[in-house]
């Protein structure tokens, strides 16, 4: 590997160490090299975007280890540019919030994200966006994970009576 990359074996080892710190499982065998055993469980930008088949959603991804809220960062971006479909992800939020500015605990281990959308429909339909988004999330969870979540009015997704997701819309 060091010959192909034209770097020292120590440099390869340091890079492998960095890759492991991102959650990738890498096996090493003396005199043979390294082998990727399993990918990271983190929502890393390149993991999110590599197989996307969308026109605009997720074409740009911002990733943070910790942030106050992904929503605040997304609002700043949205106010300065027209980045439609941009996704903001963080491993942990220190100031997560829900509807009516209620505190929302967002420790490491969850999926904390915001998506910037500039929809092309009449603003009177905006009230339908949270329920439509929650419904789409339920359908995706059921299809991919083969479990049946439920909607709790107006913006929550629950599983066995426990909240697993909430959809918050800011304008």
Segments from the language model and where they lie:
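N-terminal lobe of the biotin/lipoate ligase/transferase fold
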Residues: 1-143, 163-165
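Acidic (Asp/Glu) carboxylate-rich active-site/surface patches
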Residues: 136-171
């Amino acid at each position: 590997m060091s010959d192909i990359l034209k770097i020292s074996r120590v440099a390869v080892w340091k890079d492998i160490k960095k890759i492991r710190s991102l959650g990738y499982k890498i096996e090493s065998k003396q005199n043979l090299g390294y082998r990727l055993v399993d990918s990271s469980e983190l929502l890393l930008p390149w993991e999110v975007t590599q197989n996307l088949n969308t026109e605009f959603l997720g074409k740009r991804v911002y990733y943070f280890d910790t942030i106050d809220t992904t929503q605040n960062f997304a609002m700043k971006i949205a106010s300065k540019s027209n980045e439609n479909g941009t996704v903001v992800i963080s491993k942990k939020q220190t100031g997560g919030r829900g509807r009516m500015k209620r505190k929302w605990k967002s420790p490491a281990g969850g999926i904390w994200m915001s998506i910037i959308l500039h929809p092309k429909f009449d603003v009177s339909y905006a009230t339908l966006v949270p329920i439509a988004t929650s419904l789409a999330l339920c359908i995706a969870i059921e299809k991919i994970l083969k479990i049946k979540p439920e909607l709790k009015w107006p913006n929550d997704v629950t599983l066995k009576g426990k909240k697993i997701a909430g959809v918050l819309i800011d304008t």
